[in-house]
């Protein structure tokens, strides 16, 4: 393995783990890093499989709760309501994402200006919503009404545009619909599980001929980096947003988006 390739794998893995579960768009950051830093050697297989590190991070943090939900599912009405609610929220983006997959990957993902613009727009919206005097009505993710699960799922469809952010769209949607800040982030975590697993499986199937055994050492580096970083983020994000809200992430998006647009004007 070349040292440059190892550094690329490590940096992209860290970037994936750091940004996947916060409302700043992990896809946007990785695509911009690839554009400006020339991270091309890792390839599509790498970009797909490092997501598995982030997926396993959230599964490990919520393992006991997920296992208990699985045990309670046959006989507990509230658990069934929550699991069905997650599936309802998952379906809109899954359907649209599958139908528009090729357009999203070949057109939208190839536009760094679009990514930067969406980072800026999303940052402004996140800052505005975080400053609104919203009165939370829903604090328990397992007791959301069915229509609320669907409404949050419709907001998640916005994240199919790179630079928007899956967690950002679901969190903003949840906040506007009356969900408390901590519960908004927590439900975004749960919704991430079927969404990321589905996207991972679909992308892996579409690119099944790309992966070779020679890629495995590089993928392992990115995978571990993504797992460890995402593990840290998932463990501490809920407490952070409960105390501080989402303004930090709004400013983060603005800075990255503006710097990205300026860089595109200078270097293309």
Swiss-Prot record:
Residues annotated as transmembrane: 5-25, 43-63, 81-101, 107-127, 185-205, 214-234, 248-268
Record keyword Cell wall biogenesis/degradation present: yes
Primary residence: membrane
Enzyme nomenclature, EC number: 3.6.1.27
Highest taxon of the lineage: Bacteria
Subcellular location: Cell inner membrane
Membrane topology: Multi-pass membrane protein
GO terms under biological process: cell wall organization; peptidoglycan biosynthetic process; regulation of cell shape; response to antibiotic
GO molecular function terms noted in the UniProt entry: undecaprenyl-diphosphatase activity
UniProt cross-references to Pfam families, sorted A to Z: BacA
A single cellular component GO annotation: plasma membrane
Keywords associated with the record: Antibiotic resistance, Cell inner membrane, Cell membrane, Cell shape, Cell wall biogenesis/degradation, Hydrolase, Membrane, Peptidoglycan synthesis, Transmembrane, Transmembrane helix
Primary enzyme class: hydrolase
Catalytic activity, reaction form: di-trans,octa-cis-undecaprenyl diphosphate + H2O = di-trans,octa-cis-undecaprenyl phosphate + phosphate + H(+)
InterPro entries in UniProt: UppP
Function as written in the Swiss-Prot or TrEMBL entry: Catalyzes the dephosphorylation of undecaprenyl diphosphate (UPP). Confers resistance to bacitracin.
Remarks, miscellaneous: Bacitracin is thought to be involved in the inhibition of peptidoglycan synthesis by sequestering undecaprenyl diphosphate, thereby reducing the pool of lipid carrier available.
Family assignment from sequence similarity: Belongs to the UppP family.
Protein name (Swiss-Prot/TrEMBL): Undecaprenyl-diphosphatase 1
Naturally occurring in which organism (per UniProt): Mesorhizobium japonicum (strain LMG 29417 / CECT 9101 / MAFF 303099)
Organism classification: Bacteria, Pseudomonadati, Pseudomonadota, Alphaproteobacteria, Hyphomicrobiales
Gene for this chain: uppP1
């Amino acid at each position: 393995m070349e040292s440059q390739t190892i550094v690329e794998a490590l940096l992209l893995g860290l970037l994936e783990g750091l940004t996947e579960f916060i409302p700043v768009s992990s896809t946007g950051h990785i695509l911009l890093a690839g554009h400006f830093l020339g991270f091309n050697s890792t390839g599509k297989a790498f970009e797909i499989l490092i997501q598995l590190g982030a997926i396993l991070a959230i599964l490990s943090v919520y393992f006991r709760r997920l296992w208990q939900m699985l045990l309670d599912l046959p006989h507990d009405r509230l658990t069934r309501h929550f699991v069905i609610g997650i599936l309802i929220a998952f379906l809109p983006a899954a359907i649209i994402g599958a139908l528009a997959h090729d357009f999203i990957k070949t057109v939208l993902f190839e536009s760094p200006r679009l990514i930067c613009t969406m980072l800026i727009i999303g940052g402004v919206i996140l800052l505005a919503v975080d400053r609104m005097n919203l009165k939370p009505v829903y604090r328990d993710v397992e007791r959301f009404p069915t229509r609320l699960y669907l409404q949050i799922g419709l907001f998640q469809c916005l994240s199919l545009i790179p630079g928007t952010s899956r967690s950002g769209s679901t969190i903003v949607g949840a906040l506007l619909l009356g969900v408390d800040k901590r519960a908004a982030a927590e439900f975004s975590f749960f919704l991430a599980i079927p969404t990321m697993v589905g996207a991972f499986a679909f992308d892996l199937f579409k690119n099944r001929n790309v992966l070779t055994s020679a890629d495995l050492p590089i993928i392992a580096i990115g995978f571990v980096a993504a797992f460890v970083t995402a593990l840290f983020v998932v463990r501490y994000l809920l407490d952070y947003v409960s105390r501080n809200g989402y303004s930090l992430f709004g400013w983060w998006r603005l800075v990255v988006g503006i710097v990205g647009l300026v860089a595109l004007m200078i270097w293309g």
